[in-house]
A protein has these predicted regions:
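ABC-type nucleotide-binding domain
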Residues: 40, 47-299
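Conserved E/DxxT/N motif and adjacent residues on the DHp alpha2 helix
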Residues: 30, 37, 149
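Cytosolic ends of transmembrane helices, especially the final helix of ABC transmembrane type-1 domains
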Residues: 4-31
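Flexible, glycine-biased helix-capping/connector loops in cytosolic signal-transduction modules
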Residues: 6, 34-37, 178
Length: 299
């Protein structure tokens, strides 16, 4: 009798599990069936302006009656340049770079890539030219190799190693007995925060993008590793136009151009030296991270 009761309980649990599974499956299917509100353009980028990004009085307002998240942003990033973006929490740094691959569309002004408004470009081709490394490093269950190949499926062994070297991640592979075939747990649970970030950056570099967006993606790296990473990206034969979003002045001080954001507006732009002399917000950020007497423009 007790055995029958046990089996009935198992059967009841199975029914509950199946009911939940069907409900989850329906929700997933509704996501797959959802139509994007964005439309893809048909124009193609100008090949002579490879990687050039321009904002013309661009801004975005979330929702119909929402507050402006970004307003009046104008700057030009030429091919191969590095643009640093710095500001406090909620200042609009991530929102700004998310306009480039059209994760959001500007509600005012224009964002141009290679001389063409991103809304007029073929969306698939636009995103093929861009690699984004988000704030949270995302790794999947598998191996180091399988995670890197998400960047480009047909990447060769040499290309994988080259990307790892630039991302300062080769030592991770060399420290594993299985090398590139070493196990990676879901979410990179068996790796440190810095290791996860470096592997995620390597995956982006394998795409050989024209535009590279590092959205506070080196926050777990020490200053020396961060500096080597930036130098290695700049030394590539065809360096991408790189956007470095950071709250650390040390990570963006050597950028070709720096944007300082405060409450969704650009309150200063220029080189590190210029901003240190003329931009109060940048001065405050810099002096809060370094002693005042240390800003003798050491290169």
């Amino acid at each position: 009798m007790s055995q029958i009761l046990v089996e009935l309980i198992k059967f009841a649990n199975l029914i509950i599990t199946m009911t939940k599974a069907v409900a989850c499956g329906n929700r997933i299917q509704s996501v797959f069936a959802m139509q994007s509100s964005q439309t893809s353009g048909s124009r193609h980028p100008e090949e002579t302006l490879r990687g050039q990004v321009e904002f013309r009085n661009a801004g975005i307002t979330y929702g119909v009656a929402g507050a402006e998240a970004l307003s009046g942003v104008s700057f030009l990033a030429r091919s191969g340049q590095t643009v640093g973006i710095i500001g406090g929490t909620g200042s609009g740094k991530s929102t700004l770079v998310n306009l480039i691959p059209r994760f959001y569309d500007a509600t005012q002004g224009q964002v141009l890539v290679d001389g063409v408004d991103v809304r007029e470009l073929n969306l698939e081709e636009l995103r093929r030219r861009i690699a984004v490394v988000p704030q949270k490093a995302v790794l999947f269950r598998g191996t180091i190799r399988s995670n890197l190949l998400w960047g480009r499926e047909d990447a060769t062994e040499e290309e994988l190693q080259a990307a790892l070297t630039v991302a300062q991640a080769m030592e991770i592979v060399q420290g594993k007995d299985q090398g590139l075939d070493a196990e990676v747990q879901q979410g990179g649970g068996n790796l440190s925060g810095g290791q996860r970030q470096r592997l995620t950056i390597a995956r982006a570099l394998i795409r050989q993008p024209e535009i590279l967006i590092l959205d506070d993606s080196a926050s777990a790296l020490d200053y020396a590793t961060d500096a080597r990473l930036r130098a290695a990206i700049g030394a590539l034969p065809n360096p991408p136009t790189t956007f470095v979003v950071s709250q650390r002045a040390a990570s963006i001080r050597h950028a070709d151009w720096i944007l300082v954001l405060d409450d969704g507006r650009v309150v200063g732009q220029g080189t590190h030296e210029t901003l240190l002399e003329q931009c109060p917000v940048y001065q405050e950020i810099y002096h809060s991270q370094f002693r005042k007497e240390a800003h003798s423009h050491v290169s």
